[in-house]
């Protein structure tokens, strides 16, 4: 579940509560006391905790009863002071407005009281996770995402839990869900699409170097940061696979590669296929193999029945065609995506690529 929010970058400064004026959502979340161990066998989540970074608070508000919140978002390169390691409870946070709602719970804008740190707090109900049998998926998501550090991957700072809920402390992405932005505009121009593709390729290259396969890249799982940069946000279907060979069927139908539809083993190159589908959807407004029925969609995917509208440039068609190849080894590597002439000519990425520095180590 990625949170759904498309808002002005400065709008997250509003509607935080003081302890004396807790919101209804905050009062509900406070009902259950923190417990030091999970109460169900399946809730034994990751033992290691990542430390939460600190944002310096703004000057105090002159309005009685209101908490002033800085409107400045830190640079990815800013060296943030680390909070002391400690256990968190819901009482450590001011709870703001809801950012999104999903099958297993909700996401709220939140601020850690001691350090005034702005984040998104994802609240999941244990009963729902157990009912659907997805505890292992959440456990895997926490273990993987909490260890990734990349400007185009949403940070997971920490997690805690009480008797009924699990709370994930996530980086707040002020510009919200990319899918909502795509719906708003219908399709993106070449400049924006190429920028997103460079950012995505760099983030996926970082993941693949660490033997992490995402397996579910799509607009719904991407958020946008303060400067509009892409952030991979949902690692629910991701896997840490040192052998990089898997056989599990997962992901979204329109984005499934041929090898997964045919039940073959797959590796990190499934993400290359997804990147090609995503680039097409950015530029056209719909996935390339979209069809009235699942059967027809499957047929078009395994036959790579790729049709381009006339308004696409030769450069963009070349990139998409090199990613959407039936045989995984023939797909353009992620470094090739970042260095593709169409990407280099159109991308306006602000941050330098990370893959260059990781390769030199």
UniProtKB/Swiss-Prot annotation:
Binding site for ATP: 99-107, 122
GO biological process: cellular response to UV; cleavage furrow formation; midbody abscission; mitotic cytokinesis checkpoint signaling; mitotic spindle midzone assembly; mitotic spindle organization; negative regulation of B cell apoptotic process; negative regulation of cytokinesis
Stored SUPFAM superfamilies: Protein kinase-like (PK-like) (SSF56112)
PROSITE patterns, per database record: PROTEIN_KINASE_ATP (PS00107), PROTEIN_KINASE_DOM (PS50011), PROTEIN_KINASE_ST (PS00108)
EC number(s) from the headed UniProt entry: 2.7.11.1
GO MF, one example: protein serine kinase activity
Subcellular location: Nucleus; Chromosome
Keywords, sorted A to Z: ATP-binding, Cell cycle, Cell division, Chromosome, Chromosome partition, Kinase, Magnesium, Metal-binding, Mitosis, Nucleotide-binding, Nucleus, Phosphoprotein, Serine/threonine-protein kinase, Transferase
One GO location term (cellular component): chromosome, centromeric region
Domain of life per record: Eukaryota
Bilayer-spanning residue ranges: none
Names of the cofactor(s): Mg(2+)
Catalysed reaction, written as an equation: L-seryl-[protein] + ATP = O-phospho-L-seryl-[protein] + ADP + H(+); L-threonyl-[protein] + ATP = O-phospho-L-threonyl-[protein] + ADP + H(+)
Positions of the Protein kinase domain: 93-343
Regulation: Kinase activity is stimulated by both birc5/survivin-binding and cell-cycle specific phosphorylation.
Maturation and modification: Phosphorylated, stimulates kinase activity.
UniProt-annotated catalytic positions: 216 (proton acceptor)
Principal place of residence: nucleus
Family: Belongs to the protein kinase superfamily. Ser/Thr protein kinase family. Aurora subfamily.
Protein role: Serine/threonine-protein kinase component of the chromosomal passenger complex (CPC), a complex that acts as a key regulator of mitosis. The CPC complex has essential functions at the centromere in ensuring correct chromosome alignment and segregation and is required for chromatin-induced microtubule stabilization and spindle assembly. Involved in the bipolar attachment of spindle microtubules to kinetochores and is a key regulator for the onset of cytokinesis during mitosis. Required for central/midzone spindle assembly and cleavage furrow formation.
Quaternary state and interactors: Component of the CPC at least composed of survivin/birc5, incenp, cdca8/borealin and/or cdca9/dasra-A, and aurkb/aurora-B. Interacts directly (via N-terminus and kinase domain) with incenp (via C terminus), and may weakly interact (via N-terminus) with birc5.1 to stabilize the complex. Interacts with mtus1.
UniProt name for this protein: Aurora kinase B-A
Source taxonomy: Eukaryota, Metazoa, Chordata, Craniata, Vertebrata
Gene name of this polypeptide: aurkb-a
